[in-house]
């Protein structure tokens, strides 16, 4: 099994109650609580309220980041959770967001990021460079 530097979960949430994703303060509260649920370490954050509706926000983590972008007029939110270290933290943070917003449909993808070793402990980048592909 490959060793990776991090886990990246992206999700498109459809059928979200627009009242839950329209205001900056609501998504701020949502992301702050997802950091707690994932037992992650917040470094800083930035949120922005769009006019007439919708908001966006990002929390910079010691482990990487969590972000959300909302379109209440389409009942849609896109969420991004990327962490290094314990992958269960990313899953817990994302699960908190999904459970809090109760979408009718979720399109979620999970990516291993920064593959650094193969199952035998060999450096993948070294192997790829010797093969002439990097």
Curated annotation (Swiss-Prot):
Which parts of the sequence are marked as the site Cleavage (non-hydrolytic)?
A: 63-64
Which reaction does this chain catalyze?
S-adenosyl-L-methionine + H(+) = S-adenosyl 3-(methylsulfanyl)propylamine + CO2
Record GO cellular component, one term: cytosol
Q: Name one GO molecular function term.
A: adenosylmethionine decarboxylase activity
Positions where Pyruvic acid (Ser) occurs in the chain: 64
Top enzyme class, one word, equals lyase
UniProt entry keywords in alphabetical sequence? Autocatalytic cleavage, Decarboxylase, Lyase, Polyamine biosynthesis, Pyruvate, S-adenosyl-L-methionine, Schiff base, Spermidine biosynthesis, Zymogen
**Which family is this sequence assigned to?**
Belongs to the prokaryotic AdoMetDC family. Type 1 subfamily.
**What is the recorded name of this protein?**
S-adenosylmethionine decarboxylase proenzyme
Organism of origin: Hydrogenobaculum sp. (strain Y04AAS1)
Give the gene name.
Answer: speH
């Amino acid at each position: 099994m490959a060793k990776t530097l991090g886990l990246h979960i992206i999700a498109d949430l459809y059928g979200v109650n627009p009242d839950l994703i329209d205001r900056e303060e609501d998504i701020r509260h949502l992301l702050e609580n997802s950091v707690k649920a994932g037992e992650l370490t917040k470094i800083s954050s930035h949120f922005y309220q769009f006019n007439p509706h919708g908001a966006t926000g990002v929390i910079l983590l010691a482990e990487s980041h969590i972000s959300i972008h909302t379109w209440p007029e389409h009942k849609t939110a896109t969420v991004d959770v990327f962490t290094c270290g314990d992958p269960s933290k990313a899953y817990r943070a994302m699960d908190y967001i999904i459970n809090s917003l109760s979408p009718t449909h979720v399109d979620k993808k999970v990516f291993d990021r920064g593959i650094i070793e193969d199952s035998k402990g060999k450096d993948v980048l070294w192997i790829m460079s010797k093969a002439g592909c990097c």
